[in-house]
């Protein structure tokens, strides 16, 4: 994009956890084959990062040279959202696609679309 900047709500300090959809699909298949209990199982990556870190990572992945403008007049939202994934890990499942790699894959796919 030739845009000079991208506006982002909040000041970038809110922390979020992100999981690639391929990892989610694999986790659901894993649970269908390996879990029969009725207790809830969280599926996630167990790591979080700030919205600022996410924006900077996306900026690098897509080669955006403009500014990231964080607008603190908009809400940050919940300070932190991260799941306890110890149960699914103890069953033997772990995510395999790191966030940066997943972002790169999705961007490459998107760029290849007409």
Task: Give, region by region, the residue ranges found by the protein language model.
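C-terminal substrate-binding subdomain of Rossmann-fold SDR/epimerase-dehydratase oxidoreductases
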Residues: 1-114
């Amino acid at each position: 994009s030739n845009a000079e900047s991208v506006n982002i709500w909040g000041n970038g300090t809110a922390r979020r956890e992100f999981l690639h959809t391929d990892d989610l699909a694999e986790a659901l298949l894993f649970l269908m084959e390996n879990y029969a209990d009725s207790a809830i199982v969280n599926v996630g990556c167990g790591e979080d990062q700030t919205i600022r870190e996410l924006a900077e990572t996306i900026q690098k992945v897509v080669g955006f040279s403009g500014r990231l403008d964080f607008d603190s007049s908009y809400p940050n939202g919940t300070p932190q959202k991260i799941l306890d994934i110890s149960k699914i890990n103890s069953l033997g499942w772990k995510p395999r696609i790191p966030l940066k790699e997943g972002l790169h894959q999705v961007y490459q796919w998107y760029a290849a679309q007409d």
